[in-house]
């Protein structure tokens, strides 16, 4: 699930910017408002190449922002620096430039319900459709603050229905849309289907983290091999 920022599909259908979009049964569906329940919220760091249109780096996912986030480049948090580290660097330092491009993502695993439409206007009713959604940049704080508010009030978050709309915002000449979550009713309990889906989402996160760690360790092994090779050359030079 994401917020649409284009007014036209590849097929030429005109759409409203700021609607939510989901992929379901081989086509996109759209709606200005949806209802979700949040089963799991994880955090991850990512670095994206806008020119190439593909990710450069992803970190493991964790349930809090504490500790190390091993990443696919063999580092931590895809190169995002803490404030103390960043303050020591000049503005044109490549490490600082990279750090500013790294994004912190809230990854929401849950279910979506509501009346949506295909691009041609055909209505589709969805009930508890499993979704994964990434909230970052301008979408990060609205969701983070909302979830924190639920937690502060000791809400059992997977039971809470969240009404999601969007709001138009502007920064300079750039117009964009941010999520506007509000609390709906709370269910009295989770269904067996909910519990099965939560386990599946946990398995998905675990599998993703295994993949990240494999790439992380491959990079580290490659670096060690390069260092060993350099040391071997230095040793050979010293005895000849």
Where does each model-flagged region fall?
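Weak global preference for isoleucine
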Residues: 3, 36-40, 56, 108, ...
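OB-fold ssDNA-binding interfaces and closely related basic DNA-contact patches used
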Residues: 4-124, 171-172, 176, 186-188, ...
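Detector for Asparagine
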Residues: 26, 58, 70, 105, ...
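Extended serine/threonine-enriched, polar tracts that run as long, contiguous segments within proteins
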Residues: 103-187
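Glycine- and charge-rich intrinsically disordered segments
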Residues: 1-15, 192-240
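Detector for methionine-enriched segments
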Residues: 1, 44, 116, 141-143, ...
